[in-house]
Amino acid sequence: MDGTLFPGDDDLAIPATEFFSTKADKKPEAKREAIVKADEDDNEETLKQRLTNLEKKITNVTTKFEQIEKCCKRNDEVLFRLENHAETLRAAMISLAKKIDVQTGRRPYE
């Protein structure tokens, strides 16, 4: 044993591929798409395609944020109603306890 109790305890860098793999790693070399860099040589089609892809992703993110906002708003309303309901139940239980105390003679009628 070389003195390490846990993997990674020896301060050696663990490659990230041990924890996850990307879609590009799963594709064979022949089917992988080449990475396109934004240079002056790029034609308009490639730039338009990249912009539309970016636009789609941004639209998806904003849609998800809107859904999250609606969900949080709905949860806030439900929580408010539950808090009011709990307060109403507490008041009803107190009045019931007073009524029982009066009827059993533990407390004088007020």
From Swiss-Prot:
Quick check: keyword Iron in the entry? no
Superkingdom of origin: Viruses
Question: What keywords were assigned to this record?
Answer: Coiled coil, Disulfide bond, Phosphoprotein, Virion
The cellular location(s) given in this protein's UniProt record come to: Virion
In Pfam terms, one family for this protein is: Vac_Fusion
The UniProt entry lists the main location of this chain as virion
Q: Which GO terms describe its biological process?
A: fusion of virus membrane with host plasma membrane
Q: How does it assemble?
A: Homohexamers, covalently linked. Interacts with OPG144 and OPG153.
Membership in a protein family:
Belongs to the orthopoxvirus OPG154 protein family.
Its function, per the record, reads: Structural protein involved in the envelopment of mature virion (MV) to form the wrapped virion (WV). The wrapping consists of the addition of Golgi membranes to the mature virion. Participates in mature virion (MV) movement within the infected cell. May play an indirect role in MV-cell fusion.
Protein's name according to its UniProt entry: Protein OPG154
Species of provenance: Vaccinia virus (strain Copenhagen)
Gene name of the encoded protein = OPG154
